């Protein structure tokens, strides 16, 4: 009986695909807020893109010339990094074209406007044609096909990057939560209510722990998951499917 329960749960979560003999209708008509998506951070970017991840988070720092660089490890040592421009080129080459949107989360670990302006410059000279403006939460997954959705925080304000950002976790429509906050919220009902209409992104803690999925990161409706959970797989899954 227990194996059947496990299989049923995995199928409901979208982790088991029907056999080739069945015709599966993928509902792409619902708003973005109604889809779960697994993401990747601090993983080799090209590897993550080749796996098909449509949510990538990059941690951006300033180098000695105030150019934007992306940390390759959680506890950045000022050594292991790559240029932000090279990341943009890889995203351009590997993430598009696609039937799915691509969500790029940028965490700026600098208050230097020059660096943020250079981030905007590299985005504009690589993936600009895939970017969009305006609200995205209520748009259907299908209408966002092949688009780049940019999310970031307060550090983008007052820079050339700000008008490129679709969602900020410092505004009321997006929340940035740690794994602990998402799975053990202080106000569970309030979080469930929030995620019915808005988006929550779940990120690893500072120790970048490896999770065994003992707790359901999606339990209170949090849609975007950057925690390296074993059951995580690329793509968008309708949360009521």
Model-identified regions with their sequence ranges:
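Long, acidic (Asp/Glu-rich), low-complexity accessory segments flanking structured domains
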Residues: 1-55, 62-241
């Amino acid at each position: 009986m227990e194996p059947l329960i496990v299989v049923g749960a995995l199928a409901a979560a979208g982790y088991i695909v029907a056999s080739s003999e069945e015709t599966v209708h993928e509902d792409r008509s619902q708003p973005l807020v109604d889809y779960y998506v697994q993401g990747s951070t601090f993983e080799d970017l090209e590897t993550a893109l080749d796996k098909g991840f449509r949510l990538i988070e990059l941690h951006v720092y300033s180098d000695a010339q105030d150019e934007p660089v992306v940390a390759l490890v959680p506890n950045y040592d000022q050594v292991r990094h790559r240029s932000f421009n090279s990341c943009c080129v890889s995203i351009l080459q590997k993430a598009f074209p696609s039937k799915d949107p691509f969500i790029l989360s940028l965490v700026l670990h600098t208050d230097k406007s020059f660096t943020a302006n250079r981030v905007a410059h590299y985005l504009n000279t690589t993936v600009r044609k895939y970017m969009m403006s305006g609200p995205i939460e209520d748009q259907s997954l299908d209408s966002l096909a092949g688009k780049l959705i940019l999310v970031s925080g307060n550090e983008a304000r007052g820079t050339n990057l700000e008008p490129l950002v679709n969602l900020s976790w410092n505004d009321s429509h997006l929340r940035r939560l740690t794994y602990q906050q998402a799975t053990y919220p202080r106000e569970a009902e309030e979080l469930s209510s929030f995620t019915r209409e808005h988006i929550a992104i779940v990120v690893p803690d500072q120790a970048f722990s490896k999770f065994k999925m003992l707790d359901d990161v999606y339990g209170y409706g949090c849609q975007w998951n950057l925690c390296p959970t074993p059951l995580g797989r690329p793509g968008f899954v309708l949360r009521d499917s």
